[in-house]
Amino acid sequence: MITESAINDILANPFDREWTIQGFGMLRTYLDDEQVQRLHIWDTSEAVEDVSTIHDHPWDFTSLILRGAIRNQRFALHEMGESDTGKPFTSAQIRCGVGGGLLSDPRPVRICSLGVEAYGPGDTYSMLAPELHESFPSRGAVTVIKRSF
C-alpha cells in the first residue's frame, strides 16, 4: 500500500494528478499504472441530487481509512418473489465514471440490511465484488482502496 508521506504529497499538490468524481460525491485518483490502488476523498456535498448510493463493485477490494470516518451498510439482495422481507428497491448494472451509464434494464428487487459497520483512521475493511453496500463518509474523509481483479 502507498505510504502516508506519498498521500500527503498528493493532497498538498492535487493538481499534479488526474481526478474524476463519482455521482455520490467521491473524488478519486489512481495511485499506480495498473490502477490497483486508488485514493478517495469523500465530499457528499458534491453528490448528484437523488443519486442512489447503494451499490456493488466489479472487483473485490480492501479499504484503508486515513482521515475521517466511514460507516458501511451491507445489504442482502433478493429477487422479487424469493422473499417478502426487506425494502423494495430497483437494481440495474451501471458503468461509473466518465462515459458511464446503464448497462442493463432496471429490475425490482428487495434489499435487507445486514448491519452497519463503523471505521476510523487506521481501520481497514474488505468487500467482495457482489456485496451490496452503502457508504456514509464524514465530509473530507480520505481512504485508499486496493482492488483485486
Language model segments and positions:
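Conserved hydrophobic/aromatic beta-strand scaffold that supports enzyme active sites
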Residues: R28, L39-I41, V116-A118, T124-S126, ...
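Exposed beta-sheet edge/beta-hairpin loop segments within beta-rich domains
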Residues: E134-S138
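A short, N-terminal "cap"/entry segment at the start of jelly-roll beta-barrel domains
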Residues: M1-I41
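Short, conserved beta-strand element in jelly-roll/cupin
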Residues: P58-N72, A76
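Fe(II)/2-oxoglutarate oxygenase catalytic core
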Residues: E34, E49-V51, I65, I70
